[in-house]
Amino acid sequence: MSEEKSYCGFIAIVGRPNVGKSTLLNTLLGQKISITSRKAQTTRHRIVGIHTEGEYQAIYVDTPGLHMEEKRAINRLMNKAASSSIGDVELIIFVVEGTRWTADDEMVLNKLRDGRAPVILAVNKVDNVQEKADLLPHLQFLASQMNFLDIVPLSAESGMNVDTIAGIVRKHLPEAIHHFPEDYITDRSQRFMASEIIREKLMRFLGAELPYSVTVEIERFQTNERGGYDINGLILVEREGQKKMVIGNKGSKIKTIGIEARKDMQDMFEAPVHLELWVKVKSGWADDERALRSLGYGDDV
């Protein structure tokens, strides 16, 4: 009796910052593995999300947003991580936002024109477009820019038409053995996911100025005798004023961040979590390429 066929391939999700790439990945997977925020540049590493359904395994790479600004070392490394994802995949999902088209979108498109992989254009946040009459002409404009495999208007947040994207992906997966066991949803370690959860809470609860000058290092990640995890997180900021902002009045802000992060970790790890957070000033970390690599920012480039 012949063996059943299996299909497997890598799909890059690309686009400028803040178009909803991470939300789309989370919706495609049916659960949250990539951090989301209304602020741009929330994704700093390439996150691999794995969706297995029967004989099909889609391995999604959620890239940092590509953007023109490369003054700081962290921006250069993020652009390098995003660009390197484009070259070694079977399929690309190019995410744009509603009827907006910017110089950063154009830059991403130019990179995709040079690539070999077919491109699905995902026009996200169409439910937020105020003038619906503008949508069709804009879709026609987009269609003229490149020979896309398909163009799908969708809402990653509500889930509208995300199943259409998943269906197109399945159709174009090459015949291959699965790279991961069927119960895997990411190749990232629990330690890494813990740092991402803390970073998301920092994004959510702090002002607009801070998040790009903050990163998280997990100094301790151990199982305990209660069957749970003891986790110590170090929050690095660039200035003393930022440290005060993270801690908040009488420690109120860092307490809220810790409580919310612990809840998400317990949901993700399905075990009790004891979380302790500290804040430390490390000036210039976002401009120091060696420091960035020591924090894991160059690992996937």
Swiss-Prot record:
Provide the residue span(s) of the region labelled G1.
15-22
Tell me the segments the record calls region G5: 154-156
Residue ranges of region G4? 124-127
> Where does the UniProt annotation locate this protein?
Cytoplasm; Cell inner membrane
The answer to whether UniProt assigns keyword Cell membrane to this entry is: yes
Q: State the residue spans of region: G3.
A: 62-65
Membrane topology reported for the UniProt record: Peripheral membrane protein
Report the superkingdom from the record: Bacteria
Binding-site list for GTP? 15-22, 62-66, 124-127
Region entry G2, spans: 41-45
Which coarse location class applies to the principal site listed for this UniProt protein?
cytoplasm
Q: A GO term (biological process) for this protein?
A: ribosomal small subunit assembly
Positions of the KH type-2 domain: 198-283
- The name this protein carries in UniProt is GTPase Era
Species assigned in the record: Enterobacter sp. (strain 638)
**Lineage of origin:** Bacteria, Pseudomonadati, Pseudomonadota, Gammaproteobacteria, Enterobacterales
